[in-house]
């Protein structure tokens, strides 16, 4: 079949329905059900191509995303075979192996690579072969990132969200970051992009919180003054997406102990390492974000939300004496992992 005679009436409407894996990985134990609706290759400025996955779910009406580095990291819900679909249908929604090229007619085989996907004949489920699919036991660099319009699109110096997003991409793409001595993902990893603006309160309420901050409140106080939780995000969506992608061992890019706790879903998913996200300006004063607003933001994260950072404390925010130390960070980490004995730091 060619693009010219493709008949979109043959598309199976069930592709928009949300479904789980049926084996306890997704949709059980309080996890939301997620369904990858579409996947497409995106050439990037980071070096390797990424595959952008769009997800629906039964928890909210938002379209969450997974930015996947590595063609062989495959969504189980996307690649599952569906009744009455054609190979062209599968290619158009992104359920193909290798790369698309003009004239290609088969999604499940790539003649140029000499590889073919395998499926369970009775269920249509993708069978994970090491020759074609990323092994769940591989340690995979992961960032669970929440949407931040101001930090990612409006050059905001109130937060480091945009900086963390960009750095996560660079770390996943590289094999090693010399300045931090962090082992990169070598082209394999995932940024789960959750549409949870303003720690879950939405952009409008976040802008109101900014005004309260200019009036003297910190980020925690501002949320509470607006009758919102300190953090209203739901990281279980990220967990469900990672399970759908067949990820088992996570090297988590975070300073947030709550994310470390929430990523665990025994026996299928565990955090094997926390990779710290130290603000760039703290290690190189000529780079990164330098403002009194971001210093107050980071101080509140550390002192009021328990984030795993040690301040350099040459801040504009009239710092008071602090006992924050590596020992305190270790205590916070131990607390975060009290219910997760499998984590290796």
From Swiss-Prot:
Give the pathway annotation: Cofactor biosynthesis; riboflavin biosynthesis; 5-amino-6-(D-ribitylamino)uracil from GTP: step 1/4
What is the cofactor note? Answer: Binds 1 zinc ion per subunit.
Q: What is this protein for, i.e. what is its function?
A: Catalyzes the conversion of GTP to 2,5-diamino-6-ribosylamino-4(3H)-pyrimidinone 5'-phosphate (DARP), formate and pyrophosphate.
Q: Which family does it belong to?
A: Belongs to the GTP cyclohydrolase II family.
The UniProt record gives the binding positions of Zn(2+) as 148, 159, 161
> What NCBIfam families does this protein map onto?
PRK00393.1 (NF001591), ribA (TIGR00505)
Keyword Nucleotide-binding among record annotations:
yes
The UniProt entry, under InterPro entries, shows: GTP_cyclohydro_II (IPR032677), RibA (IPR000926), RibA-like_sf (IPR036144)
- Organism of origin is Saccharomyces cerevisiae (strain ATCC 204508 / S288c)
Q: What else is known?
A: Present with 9520 molecules/cell in log phase SD medium.
Protein name (database record): GTP cyclohydrolase-2
**Region Disordered, annotated ranges:** 1-27, 312-345
One GO MF annotation is:
GTP binding
